[in-house]
């Protein structure tokens, strides 16, 4: 996997960076969210030292968050480098319990600000994250995509553990007010996220009848 050479600051407290994984034949995206406790890296791929220093600035790294069992990527590198905890659902790492592991579950808040939303039926240990500040942000793993050839779409059925369960779980997102969505695969949606989600779920509901 190649190292990202730059990042994009999409909001004052949000940044993303990306690279192409030849093995998976997919664009991989990572997010950084600055909260009261410091900066959280979500599904981190490796980023070069100079942009990393710019990204962090003088703020502490508060932890690494992994949204499912397929997204460890370069998490171990940053856990060791910054001596910070790993936040993940137990099902995402059934055969490993790294030092500093903190188990997350539905409704738990990471750093008092990031709410965990379980997305059952997608990948192993799949979660979405919700940050209420600045009109609301979702950060999602594999359950929602915004990349070619799918566009803004649900994870295809062939990759799901239980697609019906995933669809039901994703509808929990409609309980929240959110302006934007950041993805592990695809460019962010930076406005009108709630409307886009309602439209997506309406289309998905129609397609199942």
Label the predicted regions.
Residues 2, 6-8, 12-15, 21-23, 77-80, 84-125, 132-134, 161, ...:
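Metallo-beta-lactamase
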Residues 16-63:
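Pre-active-site segment of Zn-dependent metallo-hydrolases
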Residues 26, 48-51, 71, 122, ...:
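Amphipathic coiled-coil/heptad-repeat helices and related helical stalk/stem segments
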Residues 40-42, 63-66, 116, 182-183:
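Short catalytic-loop micro-motif centered on adjacent basic/acidic residues
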Residues 48-49, 69-74, 93-96, 145-147, ...:
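Active-site environment of divalent metal-dependent phosphoester hydrolases
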Residues 48-89:
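Active-site metal-binding motif and surrounding structural segment of the metallo-beta-lactamase
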Residues 55-57, 78-81, 101-102, 152-155, ...:
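Short, glycine/charged-enriched secondary-structure capping and boundary segments
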């Amino acid at each position: 996997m190649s190292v990202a050479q730059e990042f994009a600051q999409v909001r004052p407290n949000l940044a993303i960076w990306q690279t192409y994984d030849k093995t998976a034949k997919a664009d991989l995206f990572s997010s950084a969210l600055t909260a009261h406790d410091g900066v959280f890296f979500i599904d981190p791929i490796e980023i070069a030292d100079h942009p990393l220093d710019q990204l962090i600035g003088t703020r502490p790294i508060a932890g690494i968050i992994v949204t499912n069992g397929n997204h460890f990527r370069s998490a171990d590198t940053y856990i060791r480098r910054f001596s910070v905890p790993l936040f993940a659902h137990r099902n995402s790492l059934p055969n490993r319990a790294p030092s500093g592991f903190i188990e997350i579950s539905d409704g738990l808040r990471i750093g008092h600000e990031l709410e965990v939303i379980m997305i059952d039926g997608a990948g192993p240990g799949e979660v979405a994250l919700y940050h209420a500040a600045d009109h609301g942000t979702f950060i999602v793993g594999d359950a929602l995509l915004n990349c070619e050839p799918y566009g803004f779409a649900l994870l295809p059925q062939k990759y799901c553990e239980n697609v019906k369960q995933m669809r039901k779980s994703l509808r929990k997102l409609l309980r929240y007010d959110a302006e934007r969505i950041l993805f592990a695969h695809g460019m962010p949606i930076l406005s009108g996220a709630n409307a886009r989600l309602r439209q997506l779920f309406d289309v998905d509901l129609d397609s199942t009848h």
